[in-house]
Amino acid sequence: NSNEGTAKVFVVNLLDCSVMYTFGDNDEFSLRGSLSFFDGSALVDAETDTLIYPGENGILYLIRLNTKYDLNSGTLSIDPGRTVKWRYYGTRSSTESFWLGMEDSAAIYKGYIFMTDNGGNLMCLDLNTLQLVWVQDTLDDSNSTPVLEIEKGHLYLYVSTSFRLGWRSYDTATVPVWKIDAETGEIVWHTDYECTTDDGVSGGVQSTIACGKNSLADYIYVTVAKTSDNASGVLACLRKSDGSKAWEDSSSYAWSSPVCVYNKDGSGKVLYCNSTGDIRLLDGKTGKQEDVLSVSEGVIEASPAVYDNYAV
């Protein structure tokens, strides 16, 4: 929020940068009052032309956009129809801790949405019936976006959580990295890290896990913040099969999500940024440091976007 108005969602026309539609501000359907922040990224289902957006106000929005694009004139329009809203309340939800609301981005597979929330819940929701299929306890304020992976024909999720000061401890707390059966919500394995934290700068995992492909197909990569003290962290390479640690890269803590990049022969490297302004490039199999580029004296919270041979 600012002098310019209340936080909300903007639907922007990328052809002319005009604002086509806004929603989400001061929504009376929210159980979190006037809070209307949207930290995650939206998804649009092309087949149904539906915008799907979980918000920190504790509402999942489903909006039929009725998009029209005229190729000849180069014009784009939307005419949003009826908005469907879903909300929830957790068994430990309160205004002091374990808040309602989603700060992660949703993952969707065949009509099912997977999302974590501030209250330590990983939820699987049927988008056609808006009924919960299962809920798994993620212990703490969870901002890590669930990552879907099909392995031998079965769907799994990789996800983690953070450590918000005072909710579970004022000292240290366990932050697991989980592999979850996406059909049942059952925990397949977890690998635990003991983390510290600061008020407002949480330890644990704030990033999205990267699933390796090609030569890195056996591994996942996750940045874990504040593992030994408030300044330190690791990029962990874990085996998908059992969660065992293949290697770790220790540096300043990172909220940045790792990105796997590949050569034409399928060999892979891992790129991530940390809290002292470094961009680190590592061999994905061994963890050997390939290069470090210092671009800032401050924290890089953003994650690299990679296209061809360039990273932004």
Model regions: which residues?
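Short coil/turn segments that connect the beta-strands within blades of beta-propeller domains
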Residues: 47-49, 110-111, 153-155, 217-218, ...
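Loop/turn-rich, solvent-exposed surfaces of beta-rich toroidal or solenoidal domains
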Residues: 205-210, 219-236, 248-284
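Extracytoplasmic beta-rich repeat domains
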Residues: 3-6, 21-44, 75-107, 134-151, ...
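Active-site-adjacent structural elements in enzyme catalytic domains
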Residues: 1-16, 27-29, 38-73, 80, ...
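Short glycine/acidic-enriched loop and turn motifs that connect beta-strands
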Residues: 2-6, 57-59, 120-121, 163-168, ...
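Short loop/turn segments that connect beta-strands within beta-propeller blades
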Residues: 13-16, 65-68, 126-130, 181-184, ...
